[in-house]
């Protein structure tokens, strides 16, 4: 059993947006929002023929199946997912010889997802979770047909990049104020990646490989650590050794792809498009794979924001002059200066003809009162 479990909790909260007589400082952030997650399924029932009139199926030796996402499209409240599948079946015929047949088919599913939009992004993982294969008699009453029944599990995440505004500071002039705050963990400054990639992995065996009977490769799991996309590739195959014995091989290797030089966290999905192999020598196989991947890199950030503000007492500032000289430091915020003088930051900016909220050099400011 190999399980990868992601748990998401939807949190509803509120942020102070306006208050009479209060000045509110907002901070805008680009945020990766995971709008929906879920698992759907696609059932299939395929019947196909061997295409060889002189051959009947005695028994089925092994079955592999590949499944890849060929297309995906989001419209309002729905997502279309198209899947391409390939069955590889090794069987024994009536004369006792083994043979192999491959069969390709396509299927699709429309998934209902509330509140998703065409501008959203999707990360999809599709894999066969149930498969039952059996020989079946054809119209001539011969065991020359195969029926494959199964289910494909389609897990998905729907994401969007949104600009969110957070109230991070507030005050009411001439009053001592108390702010109620809360904290929220956000995925800020997201970077979107979508691309295709071909690469090669080498697998070594401790026995000689004379002939590959059947081979299968799968992407087992995907994660992002320090801006590096990691995917575990499982290779498994049946082969004949030097003594013509049927043997089984299974091994997992990790493929890593650096997405960014800045270390960030991320979400990703990998779709295996196709693969082939070359026997390098009697005990080594080079597996060549083509994938496409979807990834988001982001910075985990805990932001403290204001939910409410209240006054405690009125300040005794009756003797405060209408215009005050203030020696501002480099990189000091006009907002912080206005808050300390219980005035409006816009008055300071206009009075001193400033172009930014941050003071770029040490200077004298005229601070108007209110």
Regions found by a protein language model. Give the residues of each.
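Interfacial loop/beta elements and low-complexity acidic/Ser/Thr-rich segments
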Residues: 1-319
